[in-house]
Amino acid sequence: MAYSVVRLRKVSALGISRVLQADKGSLWRFHFEPEFGDLLRLGVLTRNYRKNSGSPKFDFTGTGTTSKFDFTDLTCPHTWYPIARKKKRKVILHVGPTNSGKTYSALKHLEQSSSGVYCGPLRLLAWEVAKRLNKANVPCDLITGQEKDLVEGATHKAVTVEMADVTSVYDCAIIDEIQMVGCKQRGFAFTRALLGIAADELHLCGDPAVVPLVEDILKVTGDDVEVHTYERLSPLVPLKVPVSSVSSIKTGDCLVTFSRKDIYAYKKTIERAGKHLCSVVYGSLPPETRTAQATRFNDETNDFDVLVASDAIGMGLNLNISRIIFSTLQKYDGSETRDLTVSEIKQIAGRAGRFQSKFPIGEVTCLHKEDLPLLHSSLKSPSPILERAGLFPTFDLLSGYSQAHPTHGLYQILEHFVENAKLSSNYFISNVEDMMKVAAIVDELPLGLQEKYLFVVSPVDVNDEISGQGLAQFAQNFSKAGIVRLREILAPDRVKVPKTPTELKELESIHKVLDLYVWLSLRLEDSFPDREVAASQKSICNLLIEQFLEGNRLNSPARFSRYLRRQKLSE
């Protein structure tokens, strides 16, 4: 069984109660993606929210005679980024469906610029762009929440959007998948990049549904806005008949389902038929493993010619898919089971048929006939216009509010902002439920606001018991000793090749905890000194996960023998 040993203080199943004292010797088993860069810059900066309003003195305690400052007034977020406001930016929207060449066009501008930054929603995309630019002799740094790969003489950066630097000046910048400003959890990071990146040219790539909102938001910034519309480069054909059985699966197919359990069930069923091997892609797989699985699926020299995946294929991976097959058009979104939205269906379906690939014409259908009407109507419909973008108070505002209310913990501060934030009609407060769960834990520890905030915005899945326990242990050890050694948390000799999907999930969880340690080590280097060890352990986890995905596949001795022969030929 793959697991690591954790010496933990217990937390509640939901991860929101206080950290409790553990019994001596009790052992707990150990389980991201948002990363945050400049959001963690400190210093209370009093902003001038209205033009020509002067520079009033603020009473942070509420006991003086000077004017009080309303820290919950978020009506003018464009004023939070003075460097960008000094520029009259040329903002170019590249909008169109999947496989329309919109991002390719923007990247051409980035390659030709004297300095620039690419901001993507996923590490996978940042990796891909950094690799592309460096190959084109454009020196490019790679910066994500968990890694910093600096290239000598770099003039460009490829970053995850949360790591976007709003204090630097660029010739050219790209924000990819800009429609994610409307994401309930991560939208604020895209809004921050949209308002805060100081670039002469800012290229925004995404769905046409975002255009009216972006144009409205940028009316107050003085930027010039252009809209370039793209059409799909290769046909996408909605089929009129379903795939009645997985026995009809063929080479190049991608079967889409929305639970980890179903992914492995379909994989097992397809492989038992003896015709195909399946690669798998889903969100909780490490990014490195997702890339490896996509590469294996695309490689025509091996037998992994079918993909079983979640909506994680919607962005970040280049895939040679002939046909998308929806096993269902419903998904559980964390609170309820609902129909897929028009945007979700179009994003996933659009992955079929890739320009200049083995399958230039894409097809899309369902397993069940009753799902076809929704599929067809969604593909014909435009995505609903986005009406609001996510927003979240800067640390400056939270820190100022904390000084005005010194008895309030971070949980109370976040709660107050959610309940009392003043917003313009273009914005909504991002969902801070997960942040508040972490805040409830760290508020019980002797930590400063800066340190609490760091843990609150860290890439932890608080809805996973093991992940929540890992964060609690890190915070507890940090508050007690100021240093967190990895050997006190993980027992690497207990990590073994998983034999079942359940054991695989535990190994994926270990990888996430190691990922969290690396993230913290890049921000608290002296307190989390074992970054190299954690990175090494992550690599081992990736290897073991790959071994499981390769080994847990064949029930046919003949097919297994053929796979072994291919492996020997490739050595």
Curated annotation (Swiss-Prot):
One of its GO terms (biological process) is positive regulation of auxin mediated signaling pathway. Activated by the presence of mitochondrial RNA. It comes from the Eukaryota. Its EC number is 3.6.4.13. The gene is SUV3. Belongs to the DExH box helicase family. The lineage of its organism: Eukaryota, Viridiplantae, Streptophyta, Embryophyta, Tracheophyta. This is DExH-box ATP-dependent RNA helicase DExH16, mitochondrial. ATP binds at residues 96-103.
